[in-house]
Amino acid sequence: MSKKRIYEYAKDLKIKSKEIIHELKKMDVEVTSHMQTLEDDQIKALDKIYKPEKAEQSEKSQQKNTQNKQQTTHNKGNQSNKGNQNNKPNNKKNNKNNKNNKNNKNNKQPKQEEPKEMPSKITYQDGITVGELAEKLNVDSSGIIKKLFLLGIMANINQSLDDETLELIVDDYGVEIEKEIVVDEEDLAIYFDDETEDENAIERPAVVTIMGHVDHGKTTLLDSIRHTKVTAGEAGGITQHIGAYQIENDGKKITFLDTPGHAAFTTMRARGAQVTDITILVVAADDGVMPQTIEAINHAKEAEVPTIVAVNKIDKPTSNPDRVMQELTEYGLIPEDWGGDTIFVPLSALSGDGIEDLLEMIVLTSEVQELKANPEKNAVGTVIEAELDKSRGPSASLLVQNGTLNVGDSLVVGNTYGRIRAMVNDLGQRIKTAGPSTPVEITGINDVPQAGDRFVVFKDEKQARRIGEARHEANVMQQRQESKSVSLDNLFEQMKQGEMKDLNVIIKGDVQGSVEALAASLMKIDVEGVNVRIIHTAVGAINESDVTLANASNGIIIGFNVRPDTGAKRAADNEGVDMRLHRVIYNVIEEIESAMKGMLDPEFEEQVIGQAEVRQTFKVSKVGTIAGSYVIDGKITRNAGVRVIRDGIVQFEGELDTLKRFKDDAKEVAQGYECGITIEKYNDLKEGDIIEAFEMVEIKR
């Protein structure tokens, strides 16, 4: 058997040399390259893998040839030796021809197979190539390339096809086509379905959030509802605070989110969680519409949920419910009695008057919304609160929005995962299952999630762990990247990338007239690609609630003649919210227009880096005055700007010419060291002068 190189053997089989090399390495054969020659025993071993039929025939043929050789040797003596010498190359040639014949036979076998039938329907993903389409249709790719050519498209086998071209080609073959939807299992949002069309869906309790101005009676109203409707099962025990609770009214359950008002409401919405079905806007009848009332209205409008107005404190002598209704009409909340669609309920949270009417209106509104969920599915929902308990470890208060949650379920919560060890309801009772719209507290997760994070239950614990770990890693990577919050500095870049359609703006000013004038001016800005959208205006300092709303809406805050309070400044830094403070309306307009056009100039501030005292001066011809100096603070650097200060008055401001330490040039000289300094275009240096070095640093906005 003649020796062959690896690539020749692979070529005969019409396969890649890498496959042959891989098989040889499995046989513990050291392979250097595809040019390496194969030994006879190696070829035999490979034949058994790639050509088992040929290997058997080769063995039989070899045995037969051996017998013939022995017989010829006995019969013909010396002549046979001569004959064998003559026949030997012929045998090799014949063997080679036989091998080629067998290879040719093997090569022809696929052609002899019956052609596969063309499917009646195929599916595809974005970016499908000509070759992949040919494989799906069971046709030769050259036919598809020809059809594309007739359509005026020059393509090769690796050319990607768009949807329109794909439909034309497939329609020509008479085959139906359907696009595959690639599902990212790590995206928890895909597990949240609309249950209104599900045949197994049943009615679920409404989830209600109470908002309003401080001291208008939100907490009192919650307490009044709770004490009126919570069953005696709570008596004698301590209520478990899990951020929400359920009551029952005429056989209908209602879930109330017991959260700190606007902040939690918008924080959840900022993370994509649509938890609330109905908002209750509490307005004091003796106080009317206040700044936080307007904020609450804007929050509810942004969340696109129905609002019921609870006019509280009607038992006070100074109460005036009609005035409240009149004021709220200015914000689009028009009472039903006045031809609008907003429900107004007069009540007294302190005495309990009107509580029954409010609950009845909540039930009525929820019936109109047709809130449904399927309890047969795996549970999905949202985190209301979360904390790290020293004795129990990480715990989370969850609101089940669909399906049924069970003790022992494996789940992914935000960017963590776990298995439910224990579950407690709002009455502090241990339970094993929780249906839709039920608030519970669980333990058993690996880390503390954030309020507003979603949770999803998986049947397979390994799947939950895999998805949880992947989300955690992705979150770590995201935190390392720069904040994606919109600011005037990155506005143009986001516009170019198509990420920005509306620029959401919150305006706070010193007087109402200024706020209205600024809002009107901003609305007139017309730059192609993005619209200015005013989502909230108010008079007064910028507070933490403004920052929370800006973060939830991916907007910016403009302060006109006002400053942010301490909490707002800290929150803006933490959340990456852009705040712009101005005193001239024209400057606001110009800045936003420039940002939209990508021409916003960077802002710099001066940063003093060091000071040196002149101890002695030397005048040198062709050089000027050299100041023998001692660095008394910070450092002096070669590229810094400098100013000469004499008796507290700036004499000159310019740049360093040279900075030397002894006779050598220095990049910088630190505090406590002497140096020689010359200043460009300035020689009037005197002993006792202070040379101050400074740098201009770009302000991060």
Swiss-Prot record:
Stretches with biased composition (Low complexity): 63-89, 97-109
Keywords attached to this entry: Cytoplasm, GTP-binding, Initiation factor, Nucleotide-binding, Protein biosynthesis
Region annotation G3: where it falls in the sequence: 258-261
Location of the region described as G2 in the Swiss-Prot/TrEMBL record: 237-241
Region named G4: 312-315
Keyword ATP-binding: no
G1: annotated segments: 212-219
Record's subcellular location: Cytoplasm
Domain tr-type G per the UniProt entry, residue ranges: 203-372
Binding-site residues, GTP: 212-219, 258-262, 312-315
A single MF term (Gene Ontology): translation initiation factor activity
Disordered, as annotated region: 48-123
InterPro entries: EF-G-like_DII, IF2_II, IF2_N, P-loop_NTPase, Small_GTP-bd, T_Tr_GTP-bd_dom, TF_IF2_bacterial-like, TIF_IF2
GO cellular component, one term: cytosol
NCBIfam families reported in the protein's UniProt record: IF-2 (TIGR00487), small_GTP (TIGR00231)
Sequence similarity: Belongs to the TRAFAC class translation factor GTPase superfamily. Classic translation factor GTPase family. IF-2 subfamily.
Its biological purpose: One of the essential components for the initiation of protein synthesis. Protects formylmethionyl-tRNA from spontaneous hydrolysis and promotes its binding to the 30S ribosomal subunits. Also involved in the hydrolysis of GTP during the formation of the 70S ribosomal complex.
Annotated HAMAP family: IF_2_B
UniProt name for this protein: Translation initiation factor IF-2
Organism of this sequence: Staphylococcus saprophyticus subsp. saprophyticus (strain ATCC 15305 / DSM 20229 / NCIMB 8711 / NCTC 7292 / S-41)
Lineage of origin: Bacteria, Bacillati, Bacillota, Bacilli, Bacillales
